[in-house]
UniProtKB/Swiss-Prot annotation:
<dbReference type="InterPro" id="IPR004126">
    <property type="entry name" value="PLipase_A2_inh_N"/>
</dbReference>
<dbReference type="InterPro" id="IPR016338">
    <property type="entry name" value="PLipase_A2-inh_b-type"/>
</dbReference>
<keyword id="KW-0593">Phospholipase A2 inhibitor</keyword>
<dbReference type="InterPro" id="IPR050918">
    <property type="entry name" value="CNF-like_PLA2_Inhibitor"/>
</dbReference>
<dbReference type="GO" id="GO:0005576">
    <property type="term" value="C:extracellular region"/>
</dbReference>
<dbReference type="Pfam" id="PF00021">
    <property type="entry name" value="UPAR_LY6"/>
</dbReference>
<comment type="subunit">
    <text>Heterodimer with phospholipase A2 inhibitor 25 kDa.</text>
</comment>
<dbReference type="InterPro" id="IPR016054">
    <property type="entry name" value="LY6_UPA_recep-like"/>
</dbReference>
<dbReference type="GO" id="GO:0019834">
    <property type="term" value="F:phospholipase A2 inhibitor activity"/>
</dbReference>
<keyword id="KW-1015">Disulfide bond</keyword>
<feature type="disulfide bond">
    <location>
        <begin position="117"/>
        <end position="146"/>
    </location>
</feature>
<feature type="disulfide bond">
    <location>
        <begin position="54"/>
        <end position="75"/>
    </location>
</feature>
<comment type="similarity">
    <text>Belongs to the CNF-like-inhibitor family.</text>
</comment>
<feature type="glycosylation site" description="N-linked (GlcNAc...) asparagine">
    <location>
        <position position="157"/>
    </location>
</feature>
<feature type="disulfide bond">
    <location>
        <begin position="6"/>
        <end position="13"/>
    </location>
</feature>
<feature type="disulfide bond">
    <location>
        <begin position="76"/>
        <end position="81"/>
    </location>
</feature>
<comment type="function">
    <text>Inhibits the enzymatic activity of phospholipase A2.</text>
</comment>
């Protein structure tokens, strides 16, 4: 099985078609959006994916300070897949739950802020991994925040290859009802 492989900031990319290795048996396109404006940007990644990642479909992680990391995944059996579309993001109100929240690069365990969960977000997610690049090498990343339901993601056991994304941690826990800062004793 072969798929088009490319990565780009923006809404489109074109790359060469390369063979996939098991268990990554489907072609896919992932569009990531980091919002809100004025710093919102999108990136697109076309690659070989495992069917477990394809089932994820979409995710919206509230990383705090009214910022979201959103992803849309479209998989197909052809070498080149359609690009997934974003629907508008529904603004919702705080629901009383809290999670650690951060979008961190160059670290697998970034120190977190407090993310105020909204709407149906009652779970906390903690994802860490490496993005493989020719230059400057592996880039570590860590995303923590509120999410509506826990994704079924399996960890990668792949060897290090160029242009690959390697997940090394996916933790999903129940959000807490009170903000952690209120639990600390006032220094008397």
């Amino acid at each position: 099985h072969s798929c088009e492989i490319c990565h780009n900031v923006g809404k489109s990319c074109e790359g060469s078609v390369e063979p996939c290795t098991s268990p990554e048996d489907q072609c896919g396109t992932v569009v990531l959006e980091f919002s809100p404006a004025p710093v919102s940007f999108r990136s697109i990644h076309k690659n070989c994916f495992s069917s477990s990642l394809c089932k994820l479909g979409s995710f919206d992680v509230n990383v705090g300070q009214n910022t979201y990391v959103r992803g849309r995944i479209q998989c197909c059996d052809e070498e080149r897949c359609e690009e997934p579309q974003f629907s508008g993001h529904c603004a919702s109100h705080p629901n009383g739950y809290y999670c650690p929240g951060i979008f961190g690069l160059f670290s697998l365990d970034s120190s977190a802020n407090e993310a105020v969960c909204k709407g149906t977000e009652t779970k906390c997610i903690n994802i860490a991994g490496y993005r493989k690049e020719m230059y400057p090498g592996d880039i570590a990343y860590n995303i923590k925040g509120c999410i509506s339901s826990c994704p079924e993601l399996s960890l990668s056991n792949r060897t290090h290859e160029v242009d690959r994304n390697e997940l090394i941690k996916v933790e999903c826990t129940d959000a807490v009802k009170i903000p952690p800062s209120e639990c600390q004793s006032s220094g008397i």
